[in-house]
């Protein structure tokens, strides 16, 4: 690999590490992979507010589904 590619990869890793630290402080419960995917989506034109809304909605739906499965008789 050319040194420039290694530098870019290292810089990207550092950015994700910093974002993960911020994410942890804000209790977002997003891991590094999820943050990386969010960054990629935003870099490709996805509206950050819309992305945040989708993540919140998916978490709400997942929580409701989990509760429903725990409450249903087997």
From Swiss-Prot:
Subunit record text: Part of the gamma-tubulin complex.
GO BP, one annotated term: gamma-tubulin complex localization
Described purpose of this protein according to its UniProt entry: Required for gamma-tubulin complex recruitment to the microtubule organizing center (MTOC).
Keyword Cytoplasm: yes
Keywords for the protein's UniProt record, in alphabetical order: Cytoplasm, Cytoskeleton
Name by which UniProt lists this protein: Mitotic-spindle organizing protein 1
Domain of life of the source: Eukaryota
Localisation per UniProt entry: Cytoplasm, Cytoskeleton, Microtubule organizing center, Spindle pole body
GO cellular component, one term: mitotic spindle pole body
Pfam families reported for this sequence: MOZART1 (PF12554)
Family: Belongs to the MOZART1 family.
């Amino acid at each position: 690999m050319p040194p420039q590619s290694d530098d870019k990869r290292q810089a990207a890793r550092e950015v994700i590490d910093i974002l993960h630290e911020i994410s942890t402080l804000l209790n977002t419960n997003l891991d590094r992979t999820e943050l990386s995917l969010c960054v990629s989506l935003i870099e490709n034109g996805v509206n950050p507010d819309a992305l945040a809304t989708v993540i919140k909605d998916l978490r709400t739906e997942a929580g409701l589904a989990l509760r429903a499965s725990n409450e249903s008789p087997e």
